Amino acid sequence: MRKLLFLATVVYTILLIIRPQEFVPGFEQIPLLQIVLLTAFGLWLFCGDKGVDLPQFKILPLLLVFIWLSLGIGGGWWGGIVSALEKMLPPMLLLVIVSGSVRSLSALKVYSFILIACAATLVYHGHLQVTTGLGWTGEPMIEGRITYSGIFNDPNDMGLLFVLAIGLCILHLRTQQGRFMRLLAWTTLGWLLYGVYLTDSRGTMLATLTVLALEIWARFGKGAVITLGVIAVPVLIAYTRLAELDAEDESAEGRIDAWYEGVQLLTQYPLFGVGWQMFSDHNSLTAHNSMVLAMAELGVLGYTVWLSLVFLSGWMIWRLAYPAGLLPQPYPPRAVTVRKETPAALPSPPEAAILPGFDAAAERLAARSLLFAACGFAVGAFFLSQSYKPMLFLNCGLIAGRYLGMREAGLRVPAYAFGANLPRVLGYALASIVGMWLLVRILL
């Protein structure tokens, strides 16, 4: 059943990114995305260990509740839950099916290959836009920046797909043994970096630099990172919009004004926010910051739930990439005491022998690639509005799948409880609100 789920997840990912149903004649009226997604979710329901004890599966329905409350209390539109479900269920279900299907290292490599190929295809579409003026989707460029159809019509959103693909491409560089495959990985990495350049997205460029810096630091040390910065930053400033990244730039000034408006809205609607996707009713620009958008629209309570998804996913992949006492169980299995993250953490799964052929070093290398890609996404999301978009949930789904895969292999992984960590996340949420307020006060 899991193989069928993996196949359905791959098909859905291709349809979501490449979107042939939107430009291939005869498919426009067929809801292929919805059909494949529901099929994948149905297959997930019949899989064995779904991993529903993970905090992500408790956060998702709770996030929907607070979205509804924000619409009703803050926005005065209780019926908006229908629209919210239509837009939020697909990315949430993407997290679910990815976490259920992309668990083994081999599955991650295949799925990452699909993601990289899809991203490279979008780069080629952008290249056609630059050279001929139009790609096969018929979408035009926006102010000299490449676009695509559907959810990647915005070059900023497309750029964050490239960031994830770059992180996964580096994973293939680190694990491939054949000369041809390594050459292919290097070529693809260069092609994806070309795509980042074509997006001309400053947030994407900073995110890409973050991924590259972390990878270089992990392999060569901080001296190499400093060298990279000395070389790369002046080049980017000279040839991209990074030269305009200051508070006096009109675009940057608009972002800061949007951040200020978001903080002000939070003070006016502190508990439940102004209402999901209602920020634009109060400001001409979107927040251009995922945290500000979530805190303004969902209030402190909903923002804390949203931040729980981000924080616990990040903490989870951090501990997998850089484990403390993360060791394979001896064979035959014996009872051990699992180190817990909090006093009220979930109980550990039944002990199991390590799976045959399990390569702990390769697994941790994969976890580090996902961690670095997630860090890059976080940097980009700080300057872009990604609070409810598919790329956030895809990153969290890959992290959850990595955790479940290593747990199934018999590794002692820390248990994570949403409720036990909620006070900590609430503290982080309040600290981030104060931090954004101080940042805006400094920049204005």
PLM-predicted stretches and their roles:
Residues 1-72, 79, 83, 106-109, ...:
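Transmembrane signal-anchor hairpin modules in multi-pass inner-membrane enzymes, especially those
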Residues 16-23, 137-151, 272-296:
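Juxtamembrane membrane-water interface segments that cap and precede transmembrane helices
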Residues 23-25, 73-82, 197-198, 243-251, ...:
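Membrane-interface helix caps and helix-loop-helix hairpins in membrane proteins
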Residues 27-34, 83-84, 150-162, 200-203, ...:
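Membrane-interface micro-motifs in multi-pass membrane enzymes
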Residues 36-43, 91-99, 160-171, 393-402:
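Hydrophobic cores of alpha-helical transmembrane segments in multi-pass inner/ER membrane proteins
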Residues 67-72, 93, 109-143, 150-218, ...:
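Alpha-helical transmembrane segments of multi-pass inner-membrane proteins
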Residues 124-133, 194-199, 215-253, 257-268, ...:
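A membrane-periplasm/extracellular boundary helix in multi-pass inner-membrane enzymes
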Residues 252-308:
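TM-adjacent membrane-interface loops and short helices in multi-pass inner/ER membrane proteins
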